[in-house]
């Protein structure tokens, strides 16, 4: 979660929705932007506890992004496995990520494949069952703008226009993995499990498999 008091803007970073790119672009565009400290969840803190700790931020422009839940779950698992492979090959950055990320340290040894990650993970790991919409509301407030990862540049440009920044022409590409059709990695049971876990997101954002 990043905040700029100069621009009066708060960015809520939902995992695997393009947030690392937004973090980097905000840092390059706004001199005073910084991570909001002291919140559970760190970079991925939810709006509710942030506003409880800092009620003055209710007056800021608040935005975040969401993503198709099936695509998001596949991207999340693939990122963890990719980091594991890179660390084993001697990549120091990946090794550091693995060492400090509590969720990754729970996931990688316990879910040997994507199927177990989907079918068991949400039941056993709170972070994996939290609907995206729950990050973006709380304390009587909702995000002013919710963009979609599927329409990333166009939606992010709307944010830049809203907070008075010059759009650079296109977004940066940070932490992007190889593109793949997530559907081919799902069985019917896995598809239905994600639909059950993220029913609130499907209802709110009208995503389909």
Regions found by a protein language model. Give the residues of each.
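Membrane-interface amphipathic segments in extracytoplasmic regions
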Residues: 1-209
